[in-house]
Amino acid sequence: MFDLVNCLIFASVILILIELIAIFTVNIVNKKFQWLIISKDQIPKLSDGGLKKFFSHGYDPVLGWIRKPNTSHSEQSGNKITNWNINSQGYRTNLENESLPNKISCFGDSFTFARQVNDNETWEYYLSKLTNTNVKNFGVGNYGLDQALLRLKREFIKNKSELVILGVVPDTISRIVSVWKHYYEYGNTFGFKPRFYLKNNELCLFKNIINSESKFSNYHLNLNKIQNFDFFYSKKF
């Protein structure tokens, strides 16, 4: 009887240790492997410091995020450091070309914005040289085609041009069924956005539900609506 009790105690200890090791391993791997979703990922805590920086440089209540006028950023990739600047009109600085007439405007995501190159290395900069015009770059990283179109609608009123270029890559299209980027790009917890959807064969707009800075602290109150309109929630979470 004594041996049986000892065996049961030993087996219980082993099972507890295995469970603790599994929990520890899952939490470690979860930080690097975005496809491993655990309970804390359902309602992640938003960094106060990160939000403060996001509000000053990138938050937009309608579009979700934007490159704000008169902001700049440096980014390192390997041994290369690149810099970008946004001018007072809200598009990427086009240096000496800004004095030229504007006939072309560009909208889209980071491929349009030309991330990881300097202001004098963007394809809009070279297109400006080829056309002898000021090609305005309104691209924003992580945008879906929906956000690019809404940005076009906003900017075209005061930045009319003869030609508009919409930059599209596969992810630009995938993002149109996303409402919270965290569900599509794990960890992108500040990225709440609008999206279009079809209702009775008509195109309708689901507006950005986190449309004020104060709503970030209580974003969980809107999770049901967000999840209902986010295609990737059901696929990943």
Predicted regions and their residues:
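Membrane/wall-proximal cationic-aromatic binding patches
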Residues: V29-L130, Q227-D230, K236-F237
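Interaction-surface signature
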Residues: N27-P61, D146-F237
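A structural signal for well-ordered alpha-helical scaffolds and beta->alpha junctions
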Residues: I14, I18, N120-E124, L145, ...
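A conserved hydrophobic secondary-structure block that centers on an alpha-helix together
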Residues: S128-L149, R154-I157
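Membrane-interface motif at the C-terminal end of an N-terminal transmembrane signal
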Residues: I14-F33
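Conserved beta-strand elements of the Class I
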Residues: K103-F107, K136, V164-L166
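N-terminal Sec-pathway targeting helices
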Residues: M1-I14
